[in-house]
Amino acid sequence: MIDHDKLPYRPCAGVMLANRDGRVFVGQRLDTSSEAWQMPQGGIDEGEDAEKAAIRELGEETGIHGGLVDIIARSREEYFYDLPDHLIGKMWGGKYRGQRQHWFLMRFMGEDSDIDIHTRHQEFRAWRWVDLGEIEKLIVPFKRALYRGLIEEFGPLV
């Protein structure tokens, strides 16, 4: 039996992408039948810095390239979440207990037609812009505290 508390956190970068109207991008996860929505995020590759990873993940998940965004802020600290026990063996080969995430607030300077979630690394089956107050109820319960922290930190800048 694996002691989950001894597993490391997976290094990750995430993007709170805000449009010019102050609404935030969320995508509905493709790998589950539940109403699981989230902001773009993903692992940091070996030797990659968090900012480059965030821009890469944004492109892989939304088709938005770095020239269409302005970086407004970087989170003051890393955010952490733990997976529920029943998911630890199913995610990332059971090597991680959850994620430690560097987050970036980015302003989307493009048009909605620039967004294409049907990418080679498709993660989302649907997407939409939402008000900050809507985000928490869309997110899976084990990530809600993390998202509350992001909204508190980035909300005034959105």
From Swiss-Prot:
Annotated InterPro entries: Nudix_hydrolase, NUDIX_hydrolase-like_dom_sf, NUDIX_hydrolase_CS, NUDIX_hydrolase_dom, RppH
- Coiled coil located at which positions? none
Which GO-annotated molecular functions does the record name? bis(5'-adenosyl)-pentaphosphatase activity; guanosine-3',5'-bis(diphosphate) 3'-diphosphatase activity
Does the record's keyword annotation contain DNA damage? Answer: no
Its Enzyme Commission number(s) read 3.6.1.-
What EC class does the entry list? hydrolase
Q: Which domain of life is it from?
A: Bacteria
Q: What region holds the Nudix hydrolase domain?
A: 8-152
> Motif (Nudix box) spans which residues?
42-63
Q: Pfam families recorded for this chain?
A: NUDIX
Q: Which UniProt keywords apply?
A: Hydrolase
Q: A GO term (biological process) for this protein?
A: nucleoside phosphate metabolic process
Task: Please give the cofactor(s) recorded in the UniProt entry for this protein.
Answer: a divalent metal cation
Q: Which HAMAP family match?
A: Nudix_RppH
Q: Which family does it belong to?
A: Belongs to the Nudix hydrolase family. RppH subfamily.
What is known about what this protein does?
Answer: Accelerates the degradation of transcripts by removing pyrophosphate from the 5'-end of triphosphorylated RNA, leading to a more labile monophosphorylated state that can stimulate subsequent ribonuclease cleavage.
Q: What is this protein called?
A: RNA pyrophosphohydrolase
Q: Which organism is it from?
A: Sphingopyxis alaskensis (strain DSM 13593 / LMG 18877 / RB2256)
